């Protein structure tokens, strides 16, 4: 069965290209963004409004509350079921999003790691609180392969990797290679958008500013008013973190926008680095709405489908 994935850094036009593919090839879109799964987080995640989806079904958007734990493994399980349902109805499933780890979990599978050990997690958390970056340094010694793939600032992932290492006495990378359950029955065309950074970064800066000017801070206030704690995971993401700091009086509006822009650019850089390691990804070196990219993508998909 055919499966198409549209990947790339934030702001590269994945949603628009996925829509065009879906319209031409009778497809449905499956979200592959780790923030768009959360309800209420709309502006800062660039979630496509219902009125702009052009009648194309979108799946795995707004499926959990901000205070719920949601792992890549859970995403892979739900996404696989969704893809199977779309295919069974004779439609083309199209993955769209920039969370490379979700895409990897879906296509290649994840190993079933040990259950969470809260006392161990508490000790690791306390150590990181005493000295920032200490957990990542330990992970580099125990599992350099995993440490190279996980950013030092992504403390939850670093903590989980260390937890698994310590509980199993094996590197996570080794366990992952042994125990993966890859997606079966599908052949996948992976398209990766790669605009020039000198063009992408200014656009990201402008988009961040637009979000703050068009209700991001009010959206955060509304989420807090619903009773969701500021410690919820999606509040750690770029844009939302700075909006929260602004509400607390820790940053003025100009500073909040500046740091959100900087963090968004850094995130885009990490996404590009991740997707460069993605096997068999076809790079399209511009934005998803560029005419030549549209044409190339449509040709690629048509050939992939044998049309």
UniProtKB/Swiss-Prot annotation:
Record: residues binding ATP: 8-15
Species this chain originates from: Solibacter usitatus (strain Ellin6076)
Cofactor: Mg(2+)
Function: Catalyzes the transfer of a dimethylallyl group onto the adenine at position 37 in tRNAs that read codons beginning with uridine, leading to the formation of N6-(dimethylallyl)adenosine (i(6)A).
Subunit architecture: Monomer.
MF GO annotations: ATP binding; tRNA dimethylallyltransferase activity
Catalysis: reaction(s): adenosine(37) in tRNA + dimethylallyl diphosphate = N(6)-dimethylallyladenosine(37) in tRNA + diphosphate
SUPFAM superfamilies: P-loop containing nucleoside triphosphate hydrolases
Region listing for Interaction with substrate tRNA, in residue ranges: 33-36
Residue numbers marked as site, Interaction with substrate tRNA: 99, 121
EC numbers, comma separated: 2.5.1.75
Enzyme class, UniProt record, top EC level: transferase
Protein name: tRNA dimethylallyltransferase
Binding site for substrate: 10-15
Presence of keyword Phosphoprotein: no
UniProt record similarity statement: Belongs to the IPP transferase family.
Protein's UniProt keywords contain Zinc: no
HAMAP family: IPP_trans
Entry's Gene Ontology BP terms: tRNA modification
UniProtKB keywords: ATP-binding, Magnesium, Nucleotide-binding, Transferase, tRNA processing
Domain of life: Bacteria
Pfam families: IPPT
């Amino acid at each position: 069965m055919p499966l198409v994935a549209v990947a790339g850094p934030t702001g590269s036009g994945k949603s628009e290209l996925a829509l065009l593919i879906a319209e031409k090839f009778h497809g449905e879109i499956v979200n592959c963004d780790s923030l768009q799964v959360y309800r209420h987080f709309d502006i800062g995640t660039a979630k496509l409004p219902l009125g702009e989806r052009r009648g194309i079904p979108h799946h795995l958007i707004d499926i959990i509350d901000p205070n719920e734990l949601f792992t890549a493994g859970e995403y892979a399980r739900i996404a696989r079921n969704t893809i199977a349902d779309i295919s069974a109805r004779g439609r083309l499933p199209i993955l769209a999003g920039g969370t490379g780890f979700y895409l990897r979990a879906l296509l290649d599978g994840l190993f079933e790691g040990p259950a969470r050990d809260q006392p161990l997690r508490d000790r690791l958390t306390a150590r990181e609180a005493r000295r920032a970056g200490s957990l990542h340094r330990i992970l580099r010694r125990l599992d350099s392969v995993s440490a190279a793939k996980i950013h030092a600032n992504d403390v939850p992932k670093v903590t989980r990797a260390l937890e698994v290492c310590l509980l199993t006495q094996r590197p996570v990378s080794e366990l992952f290679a042994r125990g993966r359950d890859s997606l079966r029955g599908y052949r996948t065309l992976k398209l990766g958008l790669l605009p020039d950074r000198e063009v992408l970064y200014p656009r990201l800066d402008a988009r961040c500013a637009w979000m703050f000017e068009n209700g991001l801070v009010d959206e955060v206030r509304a989420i807090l008013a619903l009773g969701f704690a500021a410690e919820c995971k999606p509040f750690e993401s770029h844009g939302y973190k700075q909006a929260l700091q602004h509400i607390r009086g820790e940053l003025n509006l100009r500073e909040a926008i500046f740091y959100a822009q900087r963090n968004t650019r850094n995130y885009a850089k990490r996404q590009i680095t991740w997707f460069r390691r993605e096997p068999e990804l076809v790079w399209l070196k511009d934005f998803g709405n560029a005419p030549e990219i549209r044409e190339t993508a449509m040709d690629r998909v048509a050939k992939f489908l044998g049309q």
